[in-house]
A protein has these predicted regions:
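Glycine-rich Rossmann-fold phosphate-binding loop(s) that bind the pyrophosphate
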Residues: 9-10
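C-terminal helical cap/extension that packs against the catalytic core
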Residues: 43, 359-414
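NAD(P)-binding Rossmann-fold cofactor-contacting core
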Residues: 25-42
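Beta-strand->loop->alpha-helix junctions that form or flank phosphate-binding loops
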Residues: 55-56, 92-96, 229-247, 298-302, ...
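Residue-level signal for inorganic ion chemistry
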Residues: 20, 68, 109, 138, ...
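Phosphate-binding loop of NTP-binding sites
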Residues: 3, 19-22, 43, 59-63, ...
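Glycine-rich, highly charged phosphate/nucleotide-binding loops
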Residues: 48-60
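Nucleotide phosphate-binding/pyrophosphate-handling subdomain across enzymes
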Residues: 2-3, 15-23, 132, 266-368
Length: 446
């Protein structure tokens, strides 16, 4: 039996503890919050006699620990993690721990944007085909919460973030996808090169019997496609590929061994925007690699509905359409949302600073965004990008509620109001979901 140190007592840490109890392993929990409610955590975990270390760990004997399981929100540069590394203790993430107890097949999906939509669609298709399909990972359902439910016939469809990939050791999905790579989380990963390397590492344990799905339109991924040991399947929204999945007109086509097979058209889905067509093609490529019949893939695509908080239509009030894109937490995602709007748009943006550049986002405003309402810590940085681009139609606002009120007053019939912050939510909200729910509540109250 091994002794585990769980670092981070949030949802992932709680789920890791519950899994370790079920498999008979012992553990200690560390959390940096000295006032952490240990009684509430014990109640969630289902055990009373749990050893906690809170805040200061200077007196802790690391020789008591064999393995460290770290929550994805915990930076590996935190003092506790530096101490773990200094004591040469193996570091696993929640995904790694879960994978070691998963008896079935895994599909792992990463990328800067589109992960949640693609993972959800892939799961919707797989659950029509597999005896048991599980939706797990960075998509509100920790993998550790479901790994023990797996069997040899189950398929776990996992959304995997860059934070989770940092602590991957043996994780080996049968099918992976890297949807796209644009700068994100540079506050944690420091450089774009580091971020790219972490994203690409999802394939590192795959072999010639496995598959990796890559976006041919992304030059980084097109070049990376030459290196994996596994079989590479490209998808493209702009190039007719010799092999892979591509868009011709409004038809999505699989081409393999010189034979073209139409799968569906853009009219067959409720999803809108070229970015979503790329997400669909990635899901087609992955599920086709898993042996799912084309009729099943088509049915899944036709019946799939949009993911909450991702260019989600909320309501139409006085001829103005309101869209919630709270999940647009980086500039590239926000660009896609702005470009998907069907008419002139009042945009609400700003939030937690992830050290992103906003210039490319602001460059899309001309002819699309009639007014920008800025909230959060990044509002002055975004305003500076607007000034550089000559875009002057912005206002500083203190709260999201105030932004919705101003947008409603300034909008004309036929306009759109879009919340797409291009930033994380942590400066003003617990999470992007809370930000999106508050936006929707404000719209409904108009």
């Amino acid at each position: 039996m091994s002794r585990y140190l769980i670092v981070g007592a949030g949802r992932s840490g709680i789920n890791a503890a519950q899994l370790l109890i079920k498999v008979g392993e012992d553990f200690i929990i560390y959390d940096g919050n000295e006032n952490f409610d240990t009684a509430a955590a014990c109640e969630k975990i289902g055990r009373d006699n749990i050893e906690f270390i809170l805040g200061d760990f200077s007196g802790f004997d690391f020789s008591r620990v064999d393995i460290c399981v770290v929550s994805p929100g915990v930076s590996l540069e935190m003092p506790i993690m530096k101490a773990v590394k200094e004591h040469n203790i193996p570091i696993w993430g929640e995904v790694e721990l879960a994978y070691r107890h998963d008896k079935g097949t895994v599909i792992g999906i990463t990328g800067t944007n589109g992960k949640t939509t693609t993972t959800s669609l892939t799961y919707d298709i797989m659950k029509r085909h597999a005896k048991k399909a599980l939706l797990v990972g960075n998509i509100e359902i920790p993998y550790t919460g479901y790994a023990l439910e797996s069997d040899k016939d189950s398929v776990a469809v996992a959304e995997i973030s860059s934070f989770q990939l940092e602590t991957m050791v043996t994780f080996k999905p049968h099918v992976t996808a890297i949807l796209n790579i644009t700068p994100d989380h540079l506050d944690r990963h420091k450089t774009l090169e580091n971020y790219i390397a972490i994203k690409e590492s999802i394939t590192k344990n795959q072999d010639e019997n496995d598959f990796c799905v890559l976006n041919y339109n992304d030059p980084v991924l097109r070049e990376f496609g030459k290196t994996p040991r596994c079989k590479v399947i490209f998808f493209s929204s702009s190039e007719e590929l010799e092999s892979g999945v591509f868009l011709r007109g409004d038809t999505m086509i699989i081409k393999e061994n010189g034979v073209e097979t139409p799968v569906c058209t853009t009219k067959d889905t409720s999803l809108v925007g070229m970015h979503n067509y790329e997400n669909i093609m990635a899901a087609i490529a992955m599920t086709h690699a898993m042996g799912v019949p084309l009729d099943t893939i088509r049915q899944g695509i036709k019946e799939f509905t949009a993911v909450e908080h991702r260019i989600e239509f909320v309501a139409e009030k006085n001829g103005v359409k309101y869209y919630n894109d709270s999940k647009g937490t980086n500039p590239d995602a926000a660009i896609k949302a702005v470009c998907a709007m069907p008419s002139p748009t009042i945009l609400i943006g700003g939030g937690y600073d992830k050290k992103s550049s906003y210039d490319e986002w602001v460059a899309t405003f001309e002819g699309r965004v009639k007014e920008l309402l800025l909230i959060g810590k990044t509002k002055y940085d975004i305003a500076a990008a607007c000034d550089r681009a000559g875009f002057k139609a912005y206002k500083f606002v203190d709260t999201l509620e105030e932004a919705v009120s101003i947008a409603a007053a300034d909008a004309e019939s036929g306009d759109c109001v879009l919340l797409s912050p291009a930033c994380a939510s942590w400066d003003m909200f617990k999470c992007y979901q809370q930000r999106g729910e508050i936006f929707k509540d404000c719209v409904r109250a108009l």
